[in-house]
């Protein structure tokens, strides 16, 4: 296994055609399993995303196993080719629009997630009430929301196919 990325609490390894995302003890088992479940549910849309291959414990750490997608992130391509930034941004926006056309009814709802965050905030009760009322006044829909959609979460394969990664915050 080759370590290819490390961030606070997480390590990414490449093992042939598999990617292993290993979490430290600061991540809850429920959160890790939820990330795998989110990704499995989004797989059913037909969007290009890495397939979930398994959830396991490796060296005492919970780990998710996905198919490895060969390519560069859109963020890397933007840095390597600044003259193409407008083209890449148009591509990124088109991908966002395509993603928002999908429906994944088994995912949690963003509205519920925001209500929980408001309720658990330290704001005074009157501010929390106002935020809840404003949230309830927004239009209701069931569009797929990635939750962390940014150029670093889009991998472009050598043939130009985009794959969207990191579905831990999807609703």
Functional labels for PLM-detected ranges:
Residues 2-32:
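ATP-binding glycine-rich loop module of kinase domains
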Residues 29-45:
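The N-lobe alphaC helix and its flanking beta3-alphaC-beta4 segment of protein kinase-like domains
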Residues 51-62:
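Short beta-strand micro-motifs within the conserved protein kinase catalytic domain, predominantly
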Residues 60-73:
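Conserved short submotifs of the Hanks-type protein kinase catalytic core
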Residues 157-171:
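Active-site Asp-x-Gly
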Residues 101-147, 157-159:
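An alpha-helical support segment within catalytic cores of ATP-dependent transferases
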Residues 75-110, 128, 134:
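Conserved kinase catalytic-core helix
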